Amino acid sequence: EVLTGGYYEVGVHIPEGIYTVEAQDGESAIYLIDDENGIYIWQQIGNDPENPNQAAVMDDLRLYDGALLEVKSGAALQFRSDCAQTERLHGETNPLQDSVRVEVGQTMTAGRDFPEGLYNVKSEPDWNDLMMTLPDSFLSEFAADEERRVEVISFAPKELELSYENVPIPKGTEIQTTGAAVTLEPSEKIGSTDYGEFYKE
């Protein structure tokens, strides 16, 4: 299985299993969050011999159902497993069908201008940041009065850095783009429909 930049829920977008991961070309990184099993991993993956923090191949990556895997943009990563539980995939077809285009200078709000949901974000070929300002309910109790929580996804004019898969956009989130228009395309498969759960502390 080949994954590019984006978020992947184990059991929905990739089967549970023990994987070997290798960059096909370029450099990337993975971030694994598995609260149930207490597994938290950040690992750079690529073929730069001068980067001591980077692994050419990562072995024995254990992905358990319900864990969240983030693949950073920059390279396509090959995930190989001899024990992937493909028969246990339980994602549902995304009920959303319509794509949403956001132009530079435009602000669009999930739940008002387009439905909340799980989207693949595609950028026009330019340097670009997608700014997602979350509702105040996602602020921590220690946040300053005027503070807003902003999540940023960056794009670059390279083939593997112009999209980010399976981005949760909960109701009330304001979407802006800084350098080029983006298109929000509904992801093929979804797990939980609590799209805000991803951003809860």
Language-model segments: residues:
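A glycine-anchored, Pro-Gly-centered beta-turn/N-cap motif
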Residues: 4-6, 10-18, 106, 113-118
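A charged, solvent-exposed segment within the mature domains of Sec-exported extracytoplasmic proteins
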Residues: 110-112, 116-129
